[in-house]
Amino acid sequence: SSVEPRSLSAYVWSFAAKPKGKNLVHHNVFFNQDYSDEFKKISSGRISEDPTLYVCAQEQSIKNNKNQRYEIIINAPPVSLNKISDKEEYDLCKEITFQKLKKMGLTFHPEPTTKNLTTPANFETLCPGADGSLYGLNPQKMMSTFQRPTTKTKIKGLYLTGGGVHPGPGLPMAALSGKHAAEMIKKDLALT
């Protein structure tokens, strides 16, 4: 039996800094010029030179002179498709991310370092066997949504929840998956 291809992974910068330039809201997306090209690059094992960047300004509503927490997410290939070394990966990711933000009018001080970057390989270490994938099986196939594991398993007392389980990826769907699991457990244990 063949192994089904995995969905996207990501490079995630998590850091505290002072922003300069563009005013941010809590959720910010900096789109690229060619969205389909970004995914062609990812499917060939590389990140785009012009990736879409998601920037979460976690403490945007708190006005102070201290460093504030940020998270920047860049789509990436799963580990099995990744074609570059760890050192190359870090250097490339840093250059691409912060040069693009600078062009868009946003800089951070201090700029993050290696310790602030979580890579697809780090996600694979955290969740062995997932290939660094964040969303389970590759959702590009027509029936992939219906092939996700369901909440209840064949093993008594084992229930699944999360973005790789029905109904699918993303925080709202993962939360809904958790709700489904809780309802199934209550039903199976005859709790009210």
Segments the model singles out, each with a brief description of its role:
Residues 20-21, 86-125:
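Flavin-binding catalytic cores
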Residues 61-67, 149-154:
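Short glycine/proline-enriched loop/turn "hinge" motifs that connect secondary-structure elements
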Residues 1-65:
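Mid-domain catalytic core of redox enzymes
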